[in-house]
Amino acid sequence: MLGSRLTFCYGFLHLLLQTHVLVCAYPNSDAVVRDTDTLKTLLQRLEEAYLLTVRAESLERGQVADGMPEEQSYEAEDGSQERLAEESAIGYITLDAEEARLPDRNSNGFLNPLRNTKRYSGCFGRRLDRIGSMSALGCNGGSRLSYKRS
Protein backbone atom coordinates (compact mmCIF):
# COMPACT_ATOMS: atom_id res chain seq x y z
CA MET A 1 0.00 0.00 0.00
CA LEU A 2 2.79 2.35 0.90
CA GLY A 3 4.66 1.41 -2.27
CA SER A 4 1.70 2.30 -4.51
CA ARG A 5 1.27 5.68 -2.80
CA LEU A 6 4.97 6.39 -3.17
CA THR A 7 4.95 5.52 -6.88
CA PHE A 8 1.83 7.68 -7.32
CA CYS A 9 3.59 10.64 -5.64
CA TYR A 10 6.69 10.18 -7.78
CA GLY A 11 4.55 9.93 -10.91
CA PHE A 12 2.57 13.03 -9.98
CA LEU A 13 5.78 14.95 -9.22
CA HIS A 14 7.22 13.85 -12.56
CA LEU A 15 4.05 15.04 -14.34
CA LEU A 16 4.25 18.43 -12.60
CA LEU A 17 7.89 18.83 -13.61
CA GLN A 18 7.09 18.01 -17.24
CA THR A 19 4.26 20.56 -17.36
CA HIS A 20 6.55 23.14 -15.77
CA VAL A 21 9.18 22.50 -18.45
CA LEU A 22 6.54 22.84 -21.18
CA VAL A 23 5.21 26.08 -19.70
CA CYS A 24 8.72 27.50 -19.55
CA ALA A 25 9.46 26.42 -23.13
CA TYR A 26 6.27 27.93 -24.53
CA PRO A 27 5.51 31.10 -22.56
CA ASN A 28 2.09 32.61 -22.30
CA SER A 29 1.03 34.09 -25.64
CA ASP A 30 -0.31 37.29 -24.04
CA ALA A 31 3.13 38.13 -22.68
CA VAL A 32 4.70 37.53 -26.09
CA VAL A 33 2.17 39.82 -27.77
CA ARG A 34 2.82 42.54 -25.19
CA ASP A 35 6.56 42.21 -25.68
CA THR A 36 6.27 42.48 -29.46
CA ASP A 37 4.01 45.52 -29.13
CA THR A 38 6.53 47.13 -26.79
CA LEU A 39 9.35 46.39 -29.22
CA LYS A 40 7.34 47.83 -32.13
CA THR A 41 6.67 51.08 -30.29
CA LEU A 42 10.32 51.27 -29.27
CA LEU A 43 11.36 50.77 -32.90
CA GLN A 44 8.97 53.52 -34.05
CA ARG A 45 10.38 55.92 -31.45
CA LEU A 46 13.91 55.09 -32.54
CA GLU A 47 13.07 55.68 -36.21
CA GLU A 48 11.44 59.02 -35.38
CA ALA A 49 14.46 60.10 -33.34
CA TYR A 50 16.80 59.11 -36.17
CA LEU A 51 14.75 61.03 -38.74
CA LEU A 52 14.78 64.10 -36.50
CA THR A 53 18.56 63.99 -36.16
CA VAL A 54 19.01 63.53 -39.91
CA ARG A 55 16.72 66.48 -40.62
CA ALA A 56 18.53 68.62 -38.07
CA GLU A 57 21.89 67.79 -39.65
CA SER A 58 20.58 68.54 -43.13
CA LEU A 59 19.16 71.88 -41.96
CA GLU A 60 22.51 72.76 -40.41
CA ARG A 61 24.24 72.13 -43.73
CA GLY A 62 21.54 73.99 -45.67
CA GLN A 63 20.18 71.06 -47.62
CA VAL A 64 16.67 70.83 -49.00
CA ALA A 65 14.19 69.58 -46.46
CA ASP A 66 10.42 69.30 -46.49
CA GLY A 67 8.95 72.74 -47.07
CA MET A 68 12.20 74.57 -47.88
CA PRO A 69 12.39 76.46 -51.19
CA GLU A 70 14.61 75.22 -54.02
CA GLU A 71 16.83 78.34 -53.96
CA GLN A 72 18.34 77.21 -50.67
CA SER A 73 19.25 73.84 -52.10
CA TYR A 74 22.65 72.38 -51.41
CA GLU A 75 23.16 72.03 -55.16
CA ALA A 76 23.60 75.80 -55.35
CA GLU A 77 26.58 75.64 -53.00
CA ASP A 78 30.10 75.63 -54.36
CA GLY A 79 31.49 72.92 -52.05
CA SER A 80 29.77 69.91 -53.60
CA GLN A 81 32.91 67.76 -53.37
CA GLU A 82 33.31 68.61 -49.70
CA ARG A 83 29.66 67.74 -49.11
CA LEU A 84 30.10 64.36 -50.82
CA ALA A 85 33.12 63.65 -48.65
CA GLU A 86 31.17 64.56 -45.51
CA GLU A 87 28.18 62.45 -46.50
CA SER A 88 30.32 59.44 -47.32
CA ALA A 89 32.07 59.84 -43.97
CA ILE A 90 28.71 59.94 -42.21
CA GLY A 91 27.56 56.85 -44.07
CA TYR A 92 24.73 58.08 -46.25
CA ILE A 93 24.55 59.87 -49.58
CA THR A 94 21.58 61.68 -51.01
CA LEU A 95 20.00 60.26 -54.14
CA ASP A 96 20.94 63.29 -56.25
CA ALA A 97 24.60 62.99 -55.28
CA GLU A 98 24.57 59.28 -56.10
CA GLU A 99 23.02 59.93 -59.52
CA ALA A 100 25.59 62.63 -60.24
CA ARG A 101 28.43 60.16 -59.75
CA LEU A 102 26.96 57.54 -62.11
CA PRO A 103 27.63 57.84 -65.86
CA ASP A 104 24.80 58.49 -68.25
CA ARG A 105 23.23 55.15 -69.12
CA ASN A 106 22.15 56.23 -72.60
CA SER A 107 25.62 57.23 -73.74
CA ASN A 108 27.74 54.86 -75.80
CA GLY A 109 30.54 55.00 -73.25
CA PHE A 110 28.40 53.12 -70.76
CA LEU A 111 27.64 50.18 -73.04
CA ASN A 112 30.98 49.92 -74.87
CA PRO A 113 32.72 47.81 -72.22
CA LEU A 114 29.78 45.42 -72.27
CA ARG A 115 29.74 45.14 -76.05
CA ASN A 116 33.50 44.73 -76.44
CA THR A 117 33.95 41.83 -74.04
CA LYS A 118 34.05 39.33 -76.92
CA ARG A 119 36.75 40.26 -79.40
CA TYR A 120 36.21 39.22 -82.98
CA SER A 121 39.25 38.45 -85.11
CA GLY A 122 37.32 37.41 -88.21
CA CYS A 123 39.03 34.04 -88.72
CA PHE A 124 36.23 31.62 -87.88
CA GLY A 125 33.32 33.50 -86.40
CA ARG A 126 32.41 34.70 -82.95
CA ARG A 127 31.82 31.32 -81.30
CA LEU A 128 34.75 29.52 -82.82
CA ASP A 129 36.96 32.53 -82.27
CA ARG A 130 36.11 32.40 -78.58
CA ILE A 131 36.92 28.67 -78.44
CA GLY A 132 40.05 29.15 -80.51
CA SER A 133 41.41 31.86 -78.26
CA MET A 134 41.16 29.54 -75.29
CA SER A 135 42.76 26.53 -77.02
CA ALA A 136 45.42 28.28 -79.17
CA LEU A 137 43.64 27.28 -82.37
CA GLY A 138 42.91 29.64 -85.22
CA CYS A 139 44.44 32.87 -86.45
CA ASN A 140 45.40 34.38 -83.11
CA GLY A 141 48.64 32.47 -82.86
CA GLY A 142 49.85 31.01 -79.60
CA SER A 143 47.93 30.43 -76.44
CA ARG A 144 47.98 32.68 -73.44
CA LEU A 145 49.04 29.63 -71.44
CA SER A 146 52.09 28.82 -73.55
CA TYR A 147 55.45 30.00 -72.30
CA LYS A 148 57.76 32.00 -74.52
CA ARG A 149 61.28 30.67 -74.65
CA SER A 150 64.08 33.13 -75.14
Curated annotation (Swiss-Prot):
SMART domains, per the entry: NAT_PEP (SM00183)
Gene Ontology CC terms: cytoplasm; extracellular space
Keyword entries, A-Z: Disulfide bond, Hormone, Secreted, Signal, Vasoactive
InterPro entries named in the record: Natr_peptide, Natr_peptide_CS, Natriuretic_peptide, Natriuretic_peptide_atrial
Compositionally biased tracts (Acidic residues): 68-79
Taxonomic superkingdom: Eukaryota
Residue numbers spanned by region Disordered: 62-83
Signal peptide start and end residues: 1-25
Tissue expression remark: Atrium and ventricle, and to a lessex extent in brain.
GO molecular function, one term: hormone activity
PROSITE patterns recorded: NATRIURETIC_PEPTIDE (PS00263)
Disulphide bonds in the chain: C123-C139
Family recorded in the similarity comment: Belongs to the natriuretic peptide family.
Name of the protein in its database record: Brain natriuretic peptide
Organism field: Acipenser transmontanus
Lineage: Eukaryota, Metazoa, Chordata, Craniata, Vertebrata
